[in-house]
């Protein structure tokens, strides 16, 4: 949506009590996306360590799958914020 930012700026200029929370939400999506990516990296490292060191293959697999889900969500939020 190429006009989304223009609409947000217009709402902010005319009605700041409505527009300012919209701008904050727009910025927080990328912050949440980065946090999800960092958590997903931690989960994948924990999963790889569990899979390589011990015999808890189910737990390691769960950590790897969780990291893929969180990483996908983080990439989606960052992509939607920048498009």
Swiss-Prot record:
UniProt induction comment: Expressed in the late phase of the viral replicative cycle.
Lineage summary: Viruses, Varidnaviria, Bamfordvirae, Nucleocytoviricota, Pokkesviricetes
The species this protein was found in: African swine fever virus (isolate Tick/South Africa/Pretoriuskop Pr4/1996)
GO-annotated cellular components: membrane; virion membrane
Signal sequence bounds: none
Name used for this protein in its record: Transmembrane protein EP84R
Principal subcellular localisation of the protein: virion
Subcellular location: Virion membrane
Membrane spanning residue stretches: 31-51, 59-79
């Amino acid at each position: 949506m190429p006009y989304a930012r223009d609409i947000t700026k217009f709402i902010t200029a005319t009605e700041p009590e409505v527009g300012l929370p919209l701008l904050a939400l727009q910025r927080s999506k990328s912050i949440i996306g980065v946090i999800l990516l960092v958590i997903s990296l931690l989960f994948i490292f924990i999963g790889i360590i569990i899979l390589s060191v011990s015999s808890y293959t189910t737990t390691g697999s769960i950590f790897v799958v969780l990291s893929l889900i969180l990483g996908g969500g983080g990439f989606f939020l960052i992509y939607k914020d920048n498009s």
